[in-house]
Curated annotation (Swiss-Prot):
Pfam families named among the record's database cross-references: Ribonuclease_T2 (PF00445), RNaseT2L_C (PF25488)
Disulfide pattern: C27-C46, C35-C94, C45-C171, C102-C163, C241-C277
Gene: RNY1
Protein's name according to its UniProt entry: Ribonuclease T2-like
Source organism superkingdom: Eukaryota
Catalytic residues identified in the record: H87, E156, H160
Species for this entry: Saccharomyces cerevisiae (strain ATCC 204508 / S288c) (Baker's yeast)
């Protein structure tokens, strides 16, 4: 049997939660779609907020770690040759942006042993899939770009899964589950992510429309978007390309009705402002292909420079820069900052005082003092060819402060996630490469 056909032949089932005893959410049947309610919903275990927009994101990783891998090695590293792989399931906020790493007490450092726990592998008929079987499917379909696949699973749950309000541990208790702790939420996050991924079979959809991996052929943006939209209830789907203008990612946007455990996802149009794919000449390279005209992707990019405040209050004649603790000064010398590409997207921000993060308990203040990278936040950064660019957080590029730091004073700054930006001083953060 050719491994490239493994995905097609298995026709793996979708594992619903419908028969799971004791955790069926006791929610009103007329609950509105996420992001569409006109009044407050009292029970946050039945209605997802603020992250009411769910993105099911998929990779097409074709670059192998080295040349001349055989089919077995390619599948192990990149997944089935006739399937996209899972990136994650992300709860974006209704008004834009997203939360991340929401509850450090719920974070995990292991998936393998958790899914081997006897509570998920005791022949309990209330579970539609055992933890061990689910782990097999994750290992086949959820691939990282660095070979450590479990580290991607851990990252995705810690960054996004901990922000899903309807699978908090207290929700399981409310629904009458027996002896359920936070492990059940981890199991459900991975199970539901896998289920939605299987429903959204990107490879088969493209193949049905004569868009198949090829070294020679190319496709238009309109062709690819139209094919995916047709199978997604006519809604627009986001596609992303790498620097070779080759298709490498697809995002499906959904609203949710009720709890995540209901799995009632409703397709919606992509909210992404733009794609990095060109209008024409998009490649869809087969897995294992290495373009000879380009170097391999730079997965460990670093940029060193300073951070200056840009366009303060829409052009007022004020100035400023960041010092090593993340505060704003208007006079003196700016600190050296380093932007470090994280393994799975976004960037770490660091000074010689430590890694930076946004502290939600302090009104989203920027603080740079953390010695352990596990405590570091992940920032948005889109460098230009020169290496300069704007810094954001959780999809938001608005920053603000309450006090202008005159002379040698310093002021804290804050990530502001509302369009109005209620801070007295409003600005962007521009990274300028040394």
């Amino acid at each position: 049997m050719l491994l490239k056909n493994l995905h097609s032949l298995l026709q793996l089932p979708i594992f619903s939660n419908g028969a799971d005893k004791g955790i069926e959410p006791n929610c009103p049947i007329n609950i509105p779609l996420s992001c569409s309610n006109k009044t407050d919903i009292d029970n946050s275990c039945c209605f997802e907020y603020p992250g009411g927009i769910f993105l099911q994101t998929q990779f097409w990783n074709y670059f192998p770690s080295k040349n001349d891998l055989n089919e077995t090695e390619l599948v192990k590293e990149l997944g089935p040759l006739d399937s996209f792989t899972i990136h994650g399931l992300w709860p974006d906020n209704c008004h834009g942006g997203y939360q991340q790493f929401c509850n450090r007490s719920l974070q995990i450092d292991d998936v393998y042993y958790l899914l081997h726990d006897k509570k998920f592998n005791n022949n309990d008929t209330s579970l539609q899939i055992s933890g061990e079987k689910l782990l097999e499917y994750l290992d086949l379909y959820w691939k990282s770009n660095n070979g450590n696949h479990e580290s991607l699973w851990i990252h995705e749950f810690n960054k996004h899964g901990t922000c899903i309000s309807t699978i908090r541990p207290e929700c399981y208790t409310e629904w009458g589950a027996n002896s359920v702790d936070r492990k059940r939420a981890v199991y459900d996050y991975f199970r539901i992510t896998y289920n939605l991924f299987k429903k959204l079979d990107t490879f088969s959809t493209l193949e049905k429309n004569n868009i198949v991996p090829s070294v020679d052929n190319s496709y238009s943006l309109e062709q690819i978007e139209a094919a995916l939209s047709k199978e997604f209830e006519g809604k627009k789907v986001f596609i992303g390309c790498d620097r070779h203008n080759s298709l490498n990612e697809v995002w499906y946007y959904n609203h949710l009705k009720g709890s995540l455990l209901s799995e009632m996802f409703v397709p919606m149009d992509s909210l992404a402002i733009r794609t990095n794919c060109k209008k024409d000449g998009i490649k869809f390279f087969p897995k294992g292909y290495v373009p000879t005209f380009r170097r391999r992707p730079n997965k460990g990019a670093r940029y060193r420079g300073v951070v200056r405040l840009s366009n303060i209050n829409n052009g007022d004649q004020m100035q400023g820069f960041l010092i090593k603790n993340g505060h704003w000064m208007s006079q003196g010398t700016p600190a050296n900052y380093e932007l470090i590409k994280s393994p799975y997207g976004n960037y770490y921000l660091r000074t010689n005082q430590g890694f930076c993060d946004i502290i939600s308990s302090s009104s989203n203040e920027l603080v740079c003092k953390f010695r352990n990278i596990k405590d570091a936040g992940q920032f948005d950064f889109d460098p230009t060819k020169g290496g300069d660019g704007y810094i954001g957080y959780s999809g938001n590029y608005n920053w603000g402060g309450d006090t202008y730091p005159r002379r040698r004073n310093q002021s804290p700054i804050f990530s502001v996630d509302d369009e109005q930006n209620s801070k007295k001083y409003k600005f962007k953060l521009k990274f300028i490469k040394n």
